[in-house]
């Protein structure tokens, strides 16, 4: 047992991609800089644990406000009783945020408690959940927000250098020639392609028939199989996901925005997905992700953790995957300066596999120096009101090598 002495929110901003990257043009109106939100938990034994909530990428000041609201209810309590501390947070927040923003803060605090407890016990975080079940997990490259052939080729070169053989791109229903082109181009490297259709950000989201038409048109010009379709329709249409599973013969996945294990488990029981994508920085922390792994095993489907946050969120999700014998994890491809600072030597990729982290805690490094050099910029905020980025028409991707 070790009591919680203090809790504080830390907002950090760092360079992300470059000014001409399509995601920056779409979602970062103030330029190529991204913010993450951490929670630092200091124990009476002097150990510090760190967690992250994905909310801070989009609403950093909201993240800080909710953290400040919650922290008086945890000071002086036992860090090692993590389930009890999560219950305390639910008592504070569930009436007014049973789903949504407060769950991201609960996630951050829970991850910080796991980090602090495992550091205190001098073991990697996965040991708190029964130990790692494997020494390596296959990675898929997560990128494909590309408006030129050269940009796609640069990302394929990066995947080749790491030995990664699966690649997720972003596409919408109009991107028929673009998708066919990258399916063919990636196949030259022995790389399979999955599609994130990003319908969590669409208003209104596309319909089931839009997706089936998109897939049918691609099949007319490329014989390369799409590996999976992620968030192909909006999250409020679970029956549409079920219809897609029955009709198009491609793995259907989603779930990154779901903020409670209950909701995701209900979707699993309803046979909505071929695999699910929980995120420890969203759904309530690492213990919540463990619940999802346990449930998917009962239904013979896979859990592939979503890992598009900052370094702390990524490593928390990887720790869950190692504890539960995950088969695949996400590797974000847009350069984010804080990654090289905070991963240290703990995120290693060899021959397309993420190697098991071995440091105590969740496997991240943090210091006063990092905090001072990456101080919060209140303009470095992701905007979900997606701007027109000036992408080329689909005809740009027409290739004589396509059918």
What residue ranges belong to the model's regions?
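Motif-centric detector for short Cys/His coordination patterns
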Residues: 1-38, 54-59, 75-79, 89
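Conserved, mostly hydrophobic/aromatic
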Residues: 46, 70, 109, 122, ...
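Shared catalytic-loop signature of beta/alpha-barrel
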Residues: 225, 234-253, 258-365
């Amino acid at each position: 047992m070790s009591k919680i002495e203090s809790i504080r929110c830390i907002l950090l901003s760092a360079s992300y991609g470059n000014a001409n990257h399509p995601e920056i043009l779409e979602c970062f109106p103030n330029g190529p800089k991204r913010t993450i939100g951490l929670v630092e938990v200091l124990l009476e034994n002097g150990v510090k644990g760190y967690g992250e909530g994905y909310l801070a990428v989009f609403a950093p000041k909201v993240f800080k406000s909710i953290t400040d609201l919650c922290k008086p209810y945890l000071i002086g309590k036992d860090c090692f009783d993590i389930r009890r501390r999560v219950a305390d947070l639910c008592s504070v927040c569930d009436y007014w945020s049973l789903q949504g923003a407060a769950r991201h803060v609960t996630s951050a605090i829970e991850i910080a408690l796991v980090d602090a407890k495992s550091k205190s016990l001098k073991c990697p975080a996965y040991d708190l959940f029964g130990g790692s079940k494997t020494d390596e997990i296959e990675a898929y490259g997560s990128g494909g927000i590309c408006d030129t052939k050269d940009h796609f080729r640069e990302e394929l070169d990066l995947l080749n250098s790491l030995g990664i053989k699966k690649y997720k791109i972003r596409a919408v229903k109009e991107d028929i020639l673009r998708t066919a082109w990258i399916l063919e181009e990636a196949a030259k490297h022995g790389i399979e392609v999955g599609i994130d259709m990003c319908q969590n950000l669409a208003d209104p989201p596309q319909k089931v028939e839009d997706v089936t038409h998109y897939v049918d048109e691609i099949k007319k010009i490329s014989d390369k199989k799409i590996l999976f379709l992620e968030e192909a329709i909006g999250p409020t249409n679970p029956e549409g996901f079920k219809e897609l599973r029955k009709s198009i013969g491609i793995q259907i996945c989603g779930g990154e925005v779901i903020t409670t294990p209950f909701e995701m488990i209900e979707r699993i029981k309803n046979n909505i997905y071929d695999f699910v994508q929980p995120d420890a920085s969203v759904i309530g922390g690492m213990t919540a992700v463990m619940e999802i792994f346990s449930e998917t095993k009962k239904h013979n489907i896979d859990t592939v953790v979503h890992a598009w946050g900052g370094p702390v969120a990524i490593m928390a999700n990887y720790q869950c995957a190692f504890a539960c014998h995950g088969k695949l994890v996400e590797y974000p491809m847009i350069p984010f300066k804080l990654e090289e600072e905070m991963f240290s030597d703990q995120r290693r990729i060899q021959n397309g596999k993420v190697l098991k982290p071995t440091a105590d805690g969740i496997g991240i490094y943090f210091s006063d120096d990092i905090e001072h050099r990456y101080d919060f910029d209140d303009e470095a905020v992701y905007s979900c009101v997606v701007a027109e980025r000036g992408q080329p028409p689909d005809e740009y991707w027409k290739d004589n090598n396509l059918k």
